[in-house]
Regions:
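Rhodanese-like catalytic fold shared by cysteine-dependent sulfurtransferases
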Residues: 1-20, 27-60, 71-108
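Short, surface-exposed ligand- or partner-binding patches at beta-edge/loop junctions that are enriched
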Residues: 64
Length: 108
């Protein structure tokens, strides 16, 4: 099993299909701006078990961070832990998402 890095348009398509979005940034970053209905699991806490709790049906997940570095690390952790679902990595992160005009929400 491996993961696939995808662009913003492909990410938006997956989200429109109901794919679970996992944000691996820190809580402060998440509170400033995050994707609607995303689940926060910081990189230091990421595990197949935690993702399974958020996504019990093992459907597709889309992982993102700020710029695409932490999300790739998180995806590799899940691959190494034999996560059963399909794993996608938003290669431009939330910065690319915002730059492309896609919506975000804030908890601040």
């Amino acid at each position: 099993m491996s993961f696939k890095s995808i662009n913003i348009q492909e990410s938006a398509q997956l989200i429109s299909e109901g794919t679970l979005v996992v944000d691996v940034r820190e809580p402060g970053e998440y509170n400033e701006a995050h994707l609607v209905d995303s689940v926060l699991i910081p990189l230091g806490e990421i595990s197949a078990e935690k993702v399974n709790q958020a996504n019990p049906e093992n459907k597709k997940i889309l992982i993102h961070c700020r710029s695409g570095k932490r999300s790739k690390v998180a995806a590799n952790i899940l691959v190494n832990q034999n996560y059963a679902g399909e794993i996608f990595d938003m290669d431009a992160g939330i910065n690319g998402w915002i730059e492309s005009g896609q919506p975000v929400v804030s908890d601040n």
